[in-house]
């Protein structure tokens, strides 16, 4: 038992000099500082934006997926962030999971019906800002049905992007949907 404790503590002892030698952490280009937000219209960076999702699989476990190639805009004025406008289009055919069979099934009429509905779209209607967080209300159109949703949003950072040299801002947003409200009723409720 004493040897085990020693072996666990040893990496911590060896790491201490390394930690002590480090200077201040390097400054990232994006910092969660609202003063760095420039007013204007921002285009969604389709290469670095995605919608991640998870769904419970019959009470056994969760599985996960994503949509990529997101397009859209954010209009924002840091002097009046509550007036921000978001308009985002999600190409449904970009749905991806770790299983090709599941991905293919999700594209059928049982779920997203990509042959009939190419995209989903979120358009904001209001924003309530509280520091680094906001509740963004809007309408989500999916499978030809439009319903209101609320996005719990967190400001992540602003600054000049070193890759494209443009002013860039980043956010995370989360919501919970009841898919049957958009007509996706296969295997509901189970």
PLM segments and residue spans:
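Low-complexity, acidic/polar, glycine-enriched regions of mature
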Residues: 21-190
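Positively charged n-region of N-terminal signal peptides that target proteins for export
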Residues: 1-6
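Hydrophobic h-region of N-terminal signal peptides that target proteins for export
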Residues: 12-20
């Amino acid at each position: 038992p004493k040897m085990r404790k020693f072996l666990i503590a040893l990496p911590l002892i060896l790491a201490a000099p390394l930690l002590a030698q480090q200077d201040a952490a390097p400054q990232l280009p994006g910092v969660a500082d609202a003063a760095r937000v420039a007013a204007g219209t921002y285009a969604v960076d389709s290469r670095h934006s995605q919608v991640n999702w998870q769904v419970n699989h019959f009470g056994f476990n969760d599985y996960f997926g994503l949509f990529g190639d997101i397009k859209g805009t954010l209009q924002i004025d840091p002097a009046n962030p509550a007036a921000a406008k978001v308009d985002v289009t999600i190409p449904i055919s970009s749905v991806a999971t770790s299983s090709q069979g599941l991905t293919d099934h999700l594209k059928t009429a049982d779920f997203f019906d990509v042959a009939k509905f190419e995209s989903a779209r979120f358009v904001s209607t209001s924003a309530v800002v509280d520091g680094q967080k906001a509740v963004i209300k809007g309408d989500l159109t999916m499978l030809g049905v439009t319903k209101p949703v609320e996005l719990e949003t967190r400001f992540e950072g602003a600054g000049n992007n070193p890759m494209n040299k443009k002013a860039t801002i980043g956010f995370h947003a989360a919501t919970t949907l009841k898919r049957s409200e958009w007509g996706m009723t296969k295997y509901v409720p189970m």
